[in-house]
């Protein structure tokens, strides 16, 4: 009998903070299932979800502006603990009779809050003791408004010099507000505070672990699929790979994986995928060698968005053709993950909403009438990786840098040709190999090589050469929304450049991209 890993659950109401998904990931790290819903969720939806506790997120909005979002009134009458974070604390204060005002001195960044009263939320949690004998917490603030008056029956738990109510609490109703962000790592005791709320105050059990998620997924997959057959597009990326391993464990040979080699993959990648999933793990794989078909479709096309659409269209056509040959197949599996679901709902409604099936099948023919299987749709990317490790996939594969869906199709600038792809593959492999050798690969967030369709004069021995240019790109980022170019050592860059020019016949010059995001994007196309 498997445990009900959804038995205890936290509802996070999203007011639009850039940290909201991070907040959800922290709750999951603690071992408790949670979902992100829009702030204007209905009472009926909350009752149906039946949360053990509710967290109100931060927001870029101001609570003192007309029309700014508010939590549903039912949040405060549902009888469950509530934690308001930053904006969430401010809307809690206003809705329960307190006051919020614009702060003369805004707080962005590090702050130290002084504990003024005992509270179940932070009891025995501290970073230091100040000269006055008060416990203090090192926290991360990001607010322009502040609570000026707390509601009746609340007490001041902590404050700063400029923020009189950094933590407020109503212990009887188990309502808590924190003006800082416990979900970010800069708040040193943030995870302990969230643990105290989720496990201690809400009474949740830590049932959400990699092992229990796998066990639960296998049971649910077997119930959903029965004795039917499933087809999956296997790319070798993290999401499709973990989906394949979960399904293989659940239904074995009744899973057919279609691997489309589009000629736009990294060096030896197709062989590695086939060897790992076919030879090592024994999955049933249909290998579609389609380099010529993709390159023919891309001939003469140099506009990035047009290239992306062509690559997507040809993939769908090929996948359709193979799927139609599998007459016994009744289900299509996809590696949809929870951020895809949130993004899909946000694009449809303008905000994140209750979890719904995320159909990104694209152009699959209607006559296929396949059911949809999405075993990862409740999981964040970091959870998917941990599950992959538990299922036996290698660390290096699960934690390698992101690779775009269109592959080298958007790393060869302009028209895509086989010659360009072959040169780029070899140059990129040298760059990545040297990053590993120098122990730099895991110190940058993403690194790759770009092929530039321009020729440059070079000298080799006594001869003159006129060959192609490539650019190295390496960035450091937390969320890929913004990024800094990585300050790689000069001697390292020199070594990579020398190897590429000497070993890859056809490349005469190597440059290094020192553009941040913004203004540049991480990928060139």
Swiss-Prot record:
The keyword Iron does not apply. ATP binds at residues 235-241. Residues 9-207 form the Glutamine amidotransferase type-1 domain. The active site is at 86 (nucleophile), 181, 183. Transmembrane segments: none annotated. GO terms for molecular function: ATP binding; GMP synthase activity. SUPFAM superfamilies: Adenine nucleotide alpha hydrolases-like (SSF52402), Class I glutamine amidotransferase-like (SSF52317), GMP synthetase C-terminal dimerisation domain (SSF54810). Keywords: ATP-binding, Glutamine amidotransferase, GMP biosynthesis, Ligase, Nucleotide-binding, Purine biosynthesis. One of its GO terms (cellular component) is cytosol. Residues 208-400 form the GMPS ATP-PPase domain. Its EC number is 6.3.5.2. The keyword Transferase does not apply. It catalyses: XMP + L-glutamine + ATP + H2O = GMP + L-glutamate + AMP + diphosphate + 2 H(+). InterPro entries: Class_I_gatase-like, GATASE, GMP_synth_C, GMP_synth_GATase, GMP_synthase, GMPS_ATP_PPase_dom, NAD/GMP_synthase, Rossmann-like_a/b/a_fold. Pathway: Purine metabolism; GMP biosynthesis; GMP from XMP (L-Gln route): step 1/1. Homodimer. Catalyzes the synthesis of GMP from XMP. NCBIfam families: guaA_Cterm, guaA_Nterm, PRK00074.1. This is GMP synthase [glutamine-hydrolyzing]. The gene is guaA.
């Amino acid at each position: 009998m498997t445990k009900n890993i959804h038995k205890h659950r936290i509802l996070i109401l999203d007011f639009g903070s850039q940290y909201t998904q991070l907040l959800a990931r922290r709750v999951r790290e603690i071992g408790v299932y949670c979902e992100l819903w829009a702030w204007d969720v209905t009472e009926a939806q909350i009752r149906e979800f039946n949360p053990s506790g509710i967290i109100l997120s931060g927001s870029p909005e101001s609570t003192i502006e007309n029309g700014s979002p508010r939590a549903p009134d039912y949040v405060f009458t549902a009888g469950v603990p509530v934690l308001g974070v930053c904006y969430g604390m401010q809307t809690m204060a206003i809705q329960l009779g307190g006051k919020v005002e614009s702060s003369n001195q805004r707080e962005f960044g590090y702050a130290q809050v002084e504990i003024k009263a005992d509270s179940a939320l932070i009891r025995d949690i501290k970073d230091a003791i100040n000269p006055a004998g008060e416990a203090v917490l090192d926290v991360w603030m990001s607010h322009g408004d502040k609570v000026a008056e707390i509601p009746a029956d609340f007490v001041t738990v902590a404050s700063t010099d400029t923020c009189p109510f950094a933590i407020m609490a109503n212990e009887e109703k188990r309502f808590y507000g924190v003006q800082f962000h416990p979900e970010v790592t800069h708040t040193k005791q943030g995870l302990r505070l969230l643990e105290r709320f989720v496990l201690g105050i809400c009474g949740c059990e830590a049932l959400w672990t990699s092992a229990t998620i796998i066990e639960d997924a296998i049971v649910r997959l077997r119930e959903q699929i029965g004795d039917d057959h499933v087809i999956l597009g296997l790319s070798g990326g993290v999401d499709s790979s973990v989906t394949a391993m979960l399904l293989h464990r659940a239904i074995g040979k009744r899973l057919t994986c279609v691997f489309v080699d589009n000629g736009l993959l990294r060096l030896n990648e197709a062989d590695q995928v086939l060897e790992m999933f076919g030879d090592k793990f024994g999955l049933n794989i249909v290998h579609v060698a389609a380099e010529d078909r993709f390159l023919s479709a891309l001939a003469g096309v140099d506009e990035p968005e047009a290239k992306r659409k062509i690559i997507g269209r040809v993939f769908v056509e090929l996948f359709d053709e193979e799927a139609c040959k599998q007459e016994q197949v009744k289900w299509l599996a996809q590696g949809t993950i929870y951020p895809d679901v949130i993004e899909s709902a946000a694009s449809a409604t303008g905000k994140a909403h209750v979890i719904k099936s995320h159909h990104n099948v694209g152009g699959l023919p209607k006559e296929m009438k396949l059911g949809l299987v999405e075993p990862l749709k409740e999981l964040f990317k970091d959870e998917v990786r941990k599950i992959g490790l538990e299922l036996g996939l290698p660390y290096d594969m699960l934690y390698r840098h992101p690779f775009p869906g269109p592959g080298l199709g958007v790393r060869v600038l302009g028209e895509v040709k086989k010659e360009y792809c072959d040169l780029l593959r070899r140059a990129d492999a040298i760059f990545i190999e040297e990053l590993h050798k120098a122990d730099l690969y895991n110190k940058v967030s993403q690194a790759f090589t770009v092929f530039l369709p321009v020729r440059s004069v070079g000298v080799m021995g006594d001869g003159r050469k006129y060959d192609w240019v490539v650019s190295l790109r390496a960035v450091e980022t937390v969320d890929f929304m913004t990024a800094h170019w990585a300050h790689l050592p000069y001697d390292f860059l020199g070594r990579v450049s020398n190897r590429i020019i000497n070993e890859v016949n056809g490349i005469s010059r190597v440059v290094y991209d020192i553009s941040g995001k913004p203004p540049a994007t991480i990928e060139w196309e």
